[in-house]
Amino acid sequence: GSTAEVHDNFRNQAGAFAGTMNAIRLFNEHGIQFLINSSFTKRNQAEAPKIYKLVKDLKATAWYLFMIVPTGRGEEIMDELIQESEYEEMLNWHYDMEKEEHDLLVRPTCAPQYYRVVMQRSKEEGEKFKRRTLKFSTGGAKGCLAGQLICLIDVDGNVLPCSYFPKAAGNIREQSFKDIWENSQLFLELRDFKGYKDNCGSCEYVNVCGGCRARAYAMTGDYLAQEPFCSYQPGSSLTKTETTKDSQ
């Protein structure tokens, strides 16, 4: 949140905001670059523009907007997840903000639909949208990277598609990482967009978006199911000319 009242309520811990501000003050005093991560639910989604201003005032190097994946402690706030239509509005707000931002690196995280929004909006506006990158930044080229460009190895040796995905592709104590990465059924399925279901399976943006596989798994029990937070209907962004050609 942008204030102690909102932030401490969201974190469920009095003094959390003051502690964060003190840490940032120390970073600035010693010339240490830092980024700020913000998680958004119904409770604080209206705060995004205010948090953006605060992040700028605090001289952060980057701001990552995390869209909740209801795994782990996230399962406890399932009823606070942002609605599909409001989620879309927030991503469009981010696009407008990022397009005008030249100093701060900004990233919507666990929001693969944003890459579809970028393609849609830039095409509609006839503008090439070049996104900023930093040496330590991840993403920026496509949506969900889980099991495609990234993975995670936990303390027990389990190889997971990402930190939000509880299903393991294998264990490095039992087989080589190379074998897991190249041959595990889970990773192969995540990389095969033809196996994605419902809207994701027929979407023209699946290659750049892919939907959040961890969120699909958490909310439906099927990691190949359509992205639960996406309201886009496949084909709806095609021009009349393109639609006519496809029907001929």
Where do the PLM segments sit?
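Radical SAM enzyme [4Fe-4S]-AdoMet core and its adjacent flexible, acidic
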Residues: 1-146, 152-156, 168-169
